[in-house]
Amino acid sequence: MAQDVLTDLTKVRNIGIMAHIDAGKTTTTERILFYTGISYKIGEVHDGAATMDWMEQEQERGITITSAATTCFWNDNQINIIDTPGHVDFTVEVERSLRVLDGAVAVFDGKEGVEPQSEQVWRQADKYDVPRICFVNKMDKLGADFYFSVQTMKDRLGANVVPIQLPIGSEGDFEGVVDLVEMKAKVWRGETKLGEKYDTVEIPADLQEKAEEYRTAMIEAVAETDDELMEKYLGGEELTIEEIKSGLRKLTITSAGYPVLCGSAFKNKGVQPMLDAVIDYLPNPLDVPAAEGHVPGKEDEIISRKPSADEPFSGLAFKVATHPFFGKLTYVRVYSGKVDSGSQVVNSTKGKKERLGKLFQMHSNKENPVESASAGHIYAVIGLKDTTTGDTLCDPNQQIVLESMTFPDPVIEVAIEPKTKSDQEKLGTAIQKLAEEDPTFKVHLDQETGQTVIGGMGELHLDILVDRMRREFKVEANVGKPQVAYRETIRRKVEKVEYTHKKQTGGSGQFAKVLIDLEPFTGEDGATYEFENKVTGGRIPREYIPSVDAGAQDAMQYGVLAGYPLVNVKVTLLDGAFHEVDSSEMAFKVAGSQVLKKAAQSAQPVILEPIMAVEVTTPEDYMGDVIGDLNSRRGQIQAMEERSGARVVKAQVPLSEMFGYVGDLRSKTQGRANYSMVFDSYAEVPANVSKEIIAKATGQ
């Protein structure tokens, strides 16, 4: 059977399960694995036994951090699932899994509806145009409301959602779903504890009218996908079940609409029909457009690869993980062609040869060896030395560089000091391995203190990285207080700033003269720097131009106000001079570095700080205290709304003011409020705060 699936890609689905942190995503994935026959015992997140959560920290914290890739089978179809984390600190995991998926199941909490993180993940899925079906989970929970959840999808996501099921009963009485396509009820009765059996019965009389109303809306949405169906519908003819399913499939694959289902993964209700919907409505690798990329070194020469075994091999490495026995495991989505284990391929992103060691299809962290990798599938590879997240692997004779991913810079940093000399060595290894796995984990040496500083996307992110250093790499280290990752930028353009680097110490000297303009700049795709060369007539030899650029970029690592990285600037090299004997790449690099510092000082430099989008959910009684507290933290209230009987306050608050917020919020609201925050943008710091930051950084 597995062999058929390799050749018949219509029977393959590469999907992700995406959601807010507590919507029940891992539990849903566990149930899928159970019903498809791979897991023999259902793993519960509550007792830390979930199959997909395979790192110790994940099992302890009950959250998913790394997206494990798992293969399972359902009705002769193969489903490759990537479980993505829902916590905001791990957006990188979500971002990279969405890049390699063909479709996704968005899981929502039946009581909360669309939450801040679900909104963020939904937007990321929009960015990569991933078709989705929605699963409203936790229908057994007190306060669960399917219709409210569907309304929040319309209001907050602006999504054209099409319910194809309705719940039967709710909260403790939730017992099944109305299938609007077949107009039957599917009911899970109490006898089968694990919910593997359900009965298909007539729709309960009290739901008949509502089912008719929602079915009409569904059929109208389906009819709009196809002129023939529209004619049939307007002519008063009934659409067949096959026509409805093919219309829903078209609606989903073109992202024109999103079918909505419901259930309770924890209570084992509604999971099998959701698996049927994955097969019926989500795309197979042949339904999605051919993978596009460019010829190495020629970014404007676009080429594509179809998902066929006859095409040249190409694949994208989307995750690197450290395995206890095999060392480095690289997860690869194969987009075209076929390649055997042991083959030589090229990492076209880096221009390096690689040999594929063993190939596996993974079940969470158990591995199933295979002989070859073919288009449309996801594999784990051992033996790749230089390949990191976002790199393309391809046929050495027909190379392509596939579109990669963009990762945000860290917003929070901590200094880390090894306790002993042997810890120092272990720390080096740990940092290298963790940085390979996680592109949002950044490291640098503080030039003033000589300390190693690590940066990440939030406090939880750094906690887990430090925890992994201790557990996996046995590094004992002291960790400093979290620090905000400030940036510096400039406000105005300065023109014709000149610098001459001259050194004469016997023998050959050093000489380089440069003239630049420096101006504020924000590029597409979040680029924060641009260098333009306008030198004419050989005033600076061509081979020295890149050195000026490199020198300017070096100087940007440490800004002129408080030593924070300088961003959002454009350097235009206008003119200069050189000396036949004394000029060198090094001399022009120094000149490039010094001229940038000189220009930045007169370009009205300012400090930027990370601003977080904060959402606090609180009972009405504490509303005044919560708003007062956010205002005292330099917060700007953006909106207030009601949700499930509580009040929700949305605000933008500087990250520097949010340390320790969780404790303050608990004490102000007697533990009844909760909050979430995601990075929003960088903004200029007020003058009084700027003075404090500069004084602290320069020790004045």
Curated annotation (Swiss-Prot):
What's the stated role of this polypeptide?
Catalyzes the GTP-dependent ribosomal translocation step during translation elongation. During this step, the ribosome changes from the pre-translocational (PRE) to the post-translocational (POST) state as the newly formed A-site-bound peptidyl-tRNA and P-site-bound deacylated tRNA move to the P and E sites, respectively. Catalyzes the coordinated movement of the two tRNA molecules, the mRNA and conformational changes in the ribosome.
- Looking at the record's lineage, which domain of life comes first? Bacteria
Domain tr-type G: from-to ranges:
10-286
Q: Which Pfam families match?
A: EFG_C, EFG_III, EFG_IV, GTP_EFTU, GTP_EFTU_D2
Q: What is this protein identified as?
A: Elongation factor G
**CDD domains, from UniProt?**
EF-G (cd01886), EFG_III (cd16262), EFG_mtEFG1_IV (cd01434), EFG_mtEFG_C (cd03713), EFG_mtEFG_II (cd04088)
- Annotated keywords: Cytoplasm, Elongation factor, GTP-binding, Nucleotide-binding, Protein biosynthesis
Q: Which family does it belong to?
A: Belongs to the TRAFAC class translation factor GTPase superfamily. Classic translation factor GTPase family. EF-G/EF-2 subfamily.
Q: Cellular location of this protein?
A: Cytoplasm
GO terms (BP aspect): ribosome disassembly
Which gene codes for it?
fusA
Select a single GO molecular function from the record's annotations and give it: translation elongation factor activity
Q: Where does GTP bind?
A: 19-26, 83-87, 137-140
Record-linked Gene3D superfamilies: 3.30.230.10, 3.30.70.240, Elongation Factor G (Translational Gtpase), domain 3, P-loop containing nucleotide triphosphate hydrolases, Translation factors
Cellular component (GO) terms are: cytoplasm
